C-alpha cells in the first residue's frame, strides 16, 4: 500500500519527466550507452572505514544532542517554529545541527537549500546567543520569512562565493543543494568552487 505522500511524489516526478521530454526545461537527461551494466552497490567499504575512524567524534555529537534534549523535545510549535512532523530534514539531522550550533557557537552560517533546516538553525542560534544566517534558495521548502535570516532567492552562483570565503574557523557552511552534478550546476559550484575556498576549521554540513 503506497501512501498519499509517496504517490504525490511519484506523480510530480512523472509530470516533470514528461515536461522535459516535451521540451520544457524541467529536468536534465544524459544518455549513457552502458546504462544496462550499472549494478546496485552492495556497500561502500572505504566510506565505512572513514565513519569507523570518526566514531569518537560522532559519540561527542550524540552526547551534545542528549544535553540539549529538553530543547529538542519542545519543537513542533506553530510556524516559523521548527517541527519534527516533516520529511525534508529528518530528526537526527536536525538534532545534530541544533546541537552543533549550541556547542560551537558560530558567528556566521551560510546555508544553501533552506526551509525546515533554517527553522532549526535559527532556533539554535537564538538560544546560543545569535549567529548571522544567510540563506540561498530560490524556493525554500518551508516559510522562513519571519525568521531573522537574510534570504537570497536564487540558485547558488558565483556571486555567493565571497560569503563562503569570509567564513572563519567555527562558522558553518551548510550545503543542501540539488543533487545534479553537471557543469555549471549548483553542485558543481559547491564542490569545485565553495569547498576548496573554505578556511580551515569551518564546519561543513553536506545533506543527502
Model segments located where?
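A short alpha-helical cap/connector motif
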Residues: 1-206
Amino acid at each position: 500500500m503506497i501512501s498519499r505522500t509517496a504517490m504525490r511524489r511519484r506523480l510530480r516526478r512523472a509530470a516533470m519527466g514528461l515536461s522535459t521530454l516535451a521540451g520544457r526545461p524541467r529536468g536534465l537527461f544524459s544518455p549513457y550507452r552502458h546504462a544496462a551494466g550499472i549494478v546496485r552497490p552492495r556497500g561502500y567499504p572505504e566510506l565505512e572505514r572513514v565513519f569507523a575512524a570518526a566514531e569518537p567524534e560522532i559519540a561527542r555529537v550524540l552526547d551534545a544532542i542528549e544535553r540539549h534534549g529538553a530543547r529538542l523535545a519542545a519543537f513542533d510549535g506553530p510556524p516559523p517554529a521548527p517541527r519534527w512532523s516533516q520529511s525534508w530534514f529528518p530528526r537526527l539531522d536536525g538534532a545534530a545541527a541544533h546541537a552543533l550550533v549550541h556547542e560551537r557557537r558560530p558567528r556566521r552560517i551560510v546555508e544553501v537549500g533552506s526551509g525546515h533546516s533554517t527553522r532549526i538553525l535559527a532556533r539554535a542560534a537564538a538560544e546560543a546567543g545569535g549567529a548571522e544566517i544567510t540563506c540561498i534558495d530560490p524556493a525554500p521548502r518551508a516559510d522562513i520569512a519571519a525568521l531573522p535570516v537574510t534570504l537570497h532567492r536564487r540558485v547558488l552562483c558565483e556571486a555567493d562565493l565571497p560569503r563562503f570565503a569570509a567564513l572563519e574557523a567555527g562558522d558553518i557552511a551548510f550545503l543542501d543543494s540539488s543533487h545534479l552534478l553537471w557543469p555549471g550546476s549548483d553542485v558543481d559550484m559547491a564542490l569545485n568552487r565553495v569547498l576548496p575556498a573554505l578556511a580551515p576549521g569551518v564546519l561543513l554540513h553536506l545533506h543527502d
